[in-house]
């Protein structure tokens, strides 16, 4: 069973989000996603300063068996990327929640209220 921390918000496409004290949002892929992909070998991160609409491709993670797009969970501007995750993709396998991919400033922080909570995401992951 996947680890689904209760303090995060989730998407049905297996991204997690954490609202930070400064109003930014940290984003990564879920434990379920990294388990399904297997050993990650490549992480492509977005450009800092780039704006993305919700549900648009923002990053790519590749494993030995598949490549998967990572989608912007909400509309916003990328403010920081986790270069350590790109330099060591296996870190995402080791701890998907510590090895975040990027941070963004949301266009509308209220959009987070539309995301799945841990229980709802667990139901999605269990059905996958």
Curated annotation (Swiss-Prot):
<comment type="similarity">
    <text>Belongs to the GcvH family.</text>
</comment>
<dbReference type="GO" id="GO:0019464">
    <property type="term" value="P:glycine decarboxylation via glycine cleavage system"/>
</dbReference>
<feature type="domain" description="Lipoyl-binding">
    <location>
        <begin position="24"/>
        <end position="105"/>
    </location>
</feature>
<dbReference type="GO" id="GO:0005829">
    <property type="term" value="C:cytosol"/>
</dbReference>
<dbReference type="InterPro" id="IPR033753">
    <property type="entry name" value="GCV_H/Fam206"/>
</dbReference>
<comment type="function">
    <text>The glycine cleavage system catalyzes the degradation of glycine. The H protein shuttles the methylamine group of glycine from the P protein to the T protein.</text>
</comment>
<dbReference type="InterPro" id="IPR002930">
    <property type="entry name" value="GCV_H"/>
</dbReference>
<comment type="subunit">
    <text>The glycine cleavage system is composed of four proteins: P, T, L and H.</text>
</comment>
<dbReference type="InterPro" id="IPR011053">
    <property type="entry name" value="Single_hybrid_motif"/>
</dbReference>
<dbReference type="InterPro" id="IPR003016">
    <property type="entry name" value="2-oxoA_DH_lipoyl-BS"/>
</dbReference>
<feature type="modified residue" description="N6-lipoyllysine">
    <location>
        <position position="65"/>
    </location>
</feature>
<dbReference type="InterPro" id="IPR017453">
    <property type="entry name" value="GCV_H_sub"/>
</dbReference>
<dbReference type="GO" id="GO:0005960">
    <property type="term" value="C:glycine cleavage complex"/>
</dbReference>
<keyword id="KW-0450">Lipoyl</keyword>
<protein>
    <recommendedName>
        <fullName>Glycine cleavage system H protein</fullName>
    </recommendedName>
</protein>
<dbReference type="InterPro" id="IPR000089">
    <property type="entry name" value="Biotin_lipoyl"/>
</dbReference>
<dbReference type="Pfam" id="PF01597">
    <property type="entry name" value="GCV_H"/>
</dbReference>
């Amino acid at each position: 069973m996947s680890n689904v921390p209760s303090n995060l918000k989730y998407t049905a496409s297996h991204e997690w989000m954490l609202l930070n004290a400064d109003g930014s949002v940290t984003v990564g892929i879920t434990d379920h996603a990294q388990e399904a992909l297997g050993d990650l070998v490549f992480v492509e991160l977005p450009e800092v300063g780039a704006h993305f609409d919700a549900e648009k491709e923002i990053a790519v993670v590749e494993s030995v068996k598949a490549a998967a797009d990572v989608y912007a969970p909400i509309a916003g501007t990328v403010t920081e990327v986790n270069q350590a995750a790109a330099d060591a993709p296996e870190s995402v396998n080791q701890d998907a929640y510590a090895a975040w991919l990027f941070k963004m400033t949301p266009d509308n922080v209220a959009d987070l209220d539309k995301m799945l909570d841990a229980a709802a995401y667990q139901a999605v992951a269990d059905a996958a």
